[in-house]
Amino acid sequence: MAPELIQIDLEPRKPAPKPSWLRAKAPMGENYHDLKKLARGMNLHTVCESAQCPNIGECWNHKTATFMLLGNLCTRRCGFCAVPKGRPEPIDFDEPRRVAEAVATLGLNFAVVTSVNRDDDNVGAAQVFAQTIEQIREQKPGCRVEVLIPDFQGNDESLRIVLAAKPEILNHNTETVPRLYRAVRSGARYERTLNLLRRAKEINPAQVTKTGVMVGLGETTEELLHVYRDLARQNVDILTIGQYLRPSKDHAPMTRYYTPEEFLFMKEEAMKMGFRHVESGPLVRSSYHAHEQANSTKQPLVTI
């Protein structure tokens, strides 16, 4: 019998003790410190640090990092996100070169690149993504690239600019169920997210697409399964499902911890819907095991 996922309201309450399956190792090790020093020295930002990712120690010690473009100040105030908010600096068009140099210095064969939202200049933001892909391929031939993009406020030109650079994987996160969008995803729209994922396939049917959903914000089983079906209808290839962890008391409250068995149930249900790969677990984040996810789709390297 499938485990019952219980709906709990969004009222703040004293959090339950963190279960053992959510206790990640403290970040340490030579590779961790080397990557941190490199990012500082090249004036680069990583979402691993800005979003307080629990997997930072594991990933950085394997020389895997998700570089964050367009500065470290986001123009939106999403209730779940730990990335700082504010008025950003002008777009830095030298950033793609520095990210590519870091990728080459680290000897990465798979790079993940994301960004803050830049609602002040969606086309400029897309150009930085495209230039970063191109610079990485120039400075580290053979390196595959995954991009985790914002919704560009539905701007089709921006999406086309990124797709023209032919990333191996195009990721745009759904984050939560439609009912919780207003409280959790400031400035975003559920239908806009579905449209972006659908348009990516319409523009380039061969493009591998990916999206992620958090659980623990007050959603129900039925709502989650409805979202997975919606995403499958957009021909999304890869789905990630992970536990929401509240960054601070100023962020959206977490309603409960999901068990490993519940994550397995969600993976099994989603796989029945036609996804090529589903990564589902308490510590799963968008870029966690991204290289392995890419391999599972059997997607050959895109050449340009």
From Swiss-Prot:
[4Fe-4S] cluster 1 binds at C48, C53, C59, S287. The keyword Cell cycle does not apply. It catalyses: [[Fe-S] cluster scaffold protein carrying a second [4Fe-4S](2+) cluster] + N(6)-octanoyl-L-lysyl-[protein] + 2 oxidized [2Fe-2S]-[ferredoxin] + 2 S-adenosyl-L-methionine + 4 H(+) = [[Fe-S] cluster scaffold protein] + N(6)-[(R)-dihydrolipoyl]-L-lysyl-[protein] + 4 Fe(3+) + 2 hydrogen sulfide + 2 5'-deoxyadenosine + 2 L-methionine + 2 reduced [2Fe-2S]-[ferredoxin]. Its EC number is 2.8.1.8. SUPFAM superfamilies: Radical SAM enzymes. Its main location: cytoplasm. It is found in: Cytoplasm. This is Lipoyl synthase. It comes from Koribacter versatilis (strain Ellin345). The gene is lipA.
